[in-house]
Structures are given as structure tokens and as C-alpha cells.
């Protein structure tokens, strides 16, 4: 706000846009953000033309605080919680798919959540129905690598058919990015009509994940607590090898397939065959290294001998197995959220929220002080001091009385002059 020499005030906002100049006033309007349709933006309507405001330049105060809350605090909190929800739900659903439920069926997902979204900018070309011509779809490829951030995608001016992706949280630029490529745990697929020069999309991998997280498995009998297979050593084995662990690292392609692991020499060479004696895999056992096939990792302690056998067969009594349930418990110590455990990620999110709340409280106090000072200055310029006005009234009264006395004296003198002429 600038006071003019004629006591008029001119009001400017943002990076210099005019709200009030002399007798002219322009309206502050709220509109959809041109880059992100899920947010609102401010603009100044001058003669019917809306000029966007740079919210970073608005400063403090009620409007600045609300815009920062939307653009920074709320967006960051939503992304942090979405990152946490997507990482946890994806890991639980994946582990659920590795096991068998009480009916002996592979586990179905426990949770559902809204996946990544790509929002077109308002300036992108649209068809006659108002739908964007270009389209972009996203898919999660590694939930544990997802970042708590939105992204901006635009055509790469230096590489035709490729794109520039900017991570908005820290400004990290990925260039060039090809159709189908993965960035930070999600992949980008360009539709049949690619974005043209000047068009852009706001990518939101995790923003909606927490708000739409739902439990979709309501029957406890559907919890896949059992391992799909069990490993049994042949009682006639002569070596010292024993089964130390049977881990499931992926959903088995055929969880009901029986396999036999046979060692062909004392050096640890082995063959893995199915029930029909067809060779599935072969290799050499190394102490401390699991033997892996079809999503199954078998770890042994000790040394096998020639002719030793271990059979891996389907679980016949799922109700008596808790192997996969134990791995659900192990999820608590795994880095499921961008290198952090779920507990650490939640603690960091709450810590960041606390810092922001304290910063907002301090900013509010500072703004209140500035507002109080501005109010005092305004009162000093435009307010009424009763003592001063009373003194002025007395002065005016005395001046009036003196003027009246002068008029009375002049009237007397005039009358005297008239009488002399008679």
C-alpha cells in the first residue's frame, strides 16, 4: 500500500499487480490453477482479463497463509501420507499374494487405494467434447521407491518424442524420459496422442492414496497366513545339510507343483526336477546362498552328500501353517517407504508437521504484530484526537468572538461617521 500526496492510497499485490490505483479498483478472483486442476489460484481481473498472481510473492497475511497452506503444507502432508499408504498397502498386498488362505487358495489383496494420477494443464488442447486430446497414464512399479512429491511432465524440446519430468518437491529434473520409462517407482505411458509443445501434465503418484485407502478383505478366512509349499528332507540323506529356511520371494507361478532337489556329487552340484522327472533347473550349492526357483528360496545349513534329496511340495494343510503370517510381521522392519520403515516414515511425517505448525504459529504472531502496527499508523493518519479537537473548537470560538467584536466596532464607527454628515 502506497499513500499518495493527495491522501489517496494505491494497493498492489503479488509481484506488482494493481488492486487499487486512484479511483480505479480491480477485483481479486479465484480460479482453477492452470497447471493443477486440483488446486485454486488467485488472479486480478483488469478489464475482463485475468492476470495470474504469483502466490510466492504475496507474502504474509490471511491470503498468503491460505495459499501457502494449499500449495505447500497441505500438498506436502497429503503426499507424505499417500507415500506411506501406498508403500504399506502395496507391501501387504504383495505378501498376501505369496501365501495361501484357509481354503488353500492364493491370497487376494487386503487393501485398495487410488493409484497415480496425471492431470492435464488447462491450456492443453481439447476435443469438441472438452476432453484433453493428449493423455498420460501412470502405474506403480516399485512402491518402496515412491517419493512424497508431485511432478511436472512436458515435451523435451531437445529430444523429439521424449519428455522432461521435474520433481516439484526439490526441483530434480529427469531428462530425457521415454514413453514407458520408470521414474521414482512409477512408470509413464503416453496415450495415442502425445502432448504437443507447450502442453504439460501434473503427475501425482501418491497424492490420493491415503484419502482412498480401503480394506477390501473382510473375511478373516481369506488371510493368506500359510506358506504355499513345504520342504521335507529325505530321512535317508547321509549329509549334514538341514533345511534352515524356506522363503517366498514372489508369488509362485505354480504353487501346487511338487519338486525334488537331488544332489549329484559331494561338491554340491544339484538338479531340480518336477514330479515327472523333467529337469527344471541345475546348479551348484554354496554355503550361505539359497537355492531359488519359481519364487521359492530354500536355505540349507550343513553340507549335502551325493544322493541327498529334499522335496518341495504343496502345503496340504493350510490351517496348520503360519509361514506367511510370520513374514507379515517382518514387514515392520523392512524399508517400505523410500528407504524407511513404516514407523520411521510416520514419525518423520509427524515431526515435519510439528515443525510446520510451529512455523505457522510464529508467522501468525509476526503478522499480528505487523497488523497492529499498521492499524496504529492508520489511526494516526485518519483517526480523531478528542483533546486536540476540543482545543481547536475553543480556538474557533475565540476567533468567532473576536470577529464579532470587530464587526460591532466597525458598525459603531460607521454609525458615528453617518451622524457627522448630518
Residue ranges of each PLM-predicted region?
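S/T-rich, low-complexity, solvent-exposed segments of bacterial secretion/appendage proteins
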Residues: 1-422
Amino acid at each position: 500500500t502506497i499513500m499518495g500526496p493527495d491522501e489517496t492510497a494505491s494497493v498492489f499485490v503479488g509481484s506488482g499487480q494493481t488492486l487499487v490505483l486512484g479511483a480505479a479498483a480491480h477485483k481479486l478472483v479465484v480460479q482453477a490453477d492452470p497447471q493443477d486442476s486440483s488446486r485454486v489460484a488467485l488472479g486480478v481481473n483488469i478489464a475482463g482479463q485475468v492476470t495470474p498472481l504469483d502466490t510466492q510473492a504475496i507474502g504474509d497475511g490471511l491470503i498468503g497463509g491460505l495459499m501457502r497452506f494449499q500449495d505447500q503444507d497441505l500438498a506436502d502432508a497429503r503426499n507424505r501420507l499417500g507415500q506411506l499408504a501406498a508403500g504399506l498397502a502395496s507391501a501387504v498386498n504383495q505378501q498376501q499374494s505369496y501365501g495361501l488362505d484357509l481354503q488353500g487358495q492364493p491370497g487376494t489383496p487386503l487393501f485398495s487405494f487410488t493409484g497415480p494420477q496425471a492431470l492435464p494443464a488447462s491450456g492443453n488442447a481439447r476435443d469438441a467434447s472438452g476432453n484433453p486430446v493428449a493423455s498420460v497414464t501412470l502405474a506403480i512399479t516399485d512402491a518402496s521407491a515412491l517419493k512424497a512429491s508431485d511432478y511436472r511432465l512436458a515435451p523435451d524440446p531437445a529430444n523429439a518424442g521424449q519428455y522432461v519430468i521435474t520433481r516439484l518437491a526439490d526441483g530434480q529434473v529427469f531428462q530425457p524420459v521415454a514413453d514407458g520409462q520408470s521414474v521414482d517407482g512409477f512408470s509413464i505411458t503416453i496415450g495415442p496422442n502425445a502432448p504437443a509443445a507447450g502442453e504439460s501434465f501434473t503427475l501425482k503418484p501418491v497424492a490420493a492414496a491415503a484419502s482412498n485407502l480401503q480394506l477390501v478383505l473382510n473375511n478373516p478366512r481369506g488371510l493368506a497366513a500359510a506358506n504355499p509349499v513345504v520342504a521335507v528332507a529325505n530321512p535317508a540323506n547321509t549329509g549334514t545339510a538341514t533345511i534352515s529356511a524356506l522363503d517366498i520371494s514372489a508369488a509362485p507361478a505354480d504353487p501346487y507343483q511338487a519338486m525334488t532337489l537331488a544332489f549329484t556329487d559331494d561338491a554340491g552340484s544339484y538338479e531340480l526336477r518336477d514330479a515327472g522327472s523333467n529337469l527344471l533347473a541345475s546348479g551348484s550349492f554354496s554355503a550361505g546362498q539359497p537355492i531359488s526357483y519359481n519364487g521359492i528360496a530354500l536355505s540349507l545349513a550343513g553340507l549335502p552328500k551325493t544322493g541327498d534329496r529334499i522335496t518341495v511340495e504343496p502345503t496340504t494343510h493350510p490351517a496348520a501353517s503360519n509361514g506367511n503370517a510370520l513374514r507379515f510381521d517382518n514387514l515392520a522392519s523392512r524399508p517400505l517407504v523410500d528407504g524407511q520403515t513404516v514407523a520411521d516414515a510416520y514419525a518423520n511425517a509427524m515431526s515435519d508437521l510439528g515443525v510446520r505448525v510451529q512455523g505457522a504459529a510464529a508467522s501468525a504472531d509476526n503478522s499480528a504484530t505487523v497488523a497492529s502496527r499498521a492499524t496504529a499508523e492508520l489511526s494516526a493518519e485518519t483517526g480523531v484526537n478528542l483533546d486536540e479537537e476540543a482545543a481547536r473548537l475553543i480556538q474557533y470560538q475565540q476567533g468567532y468572538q473576536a470577529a464579532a467584536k470587530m464587526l460591532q466596532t466597525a458598525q459603531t464607527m460607521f454609525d458615528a461617521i453617518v451622524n457627522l454628515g448630518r
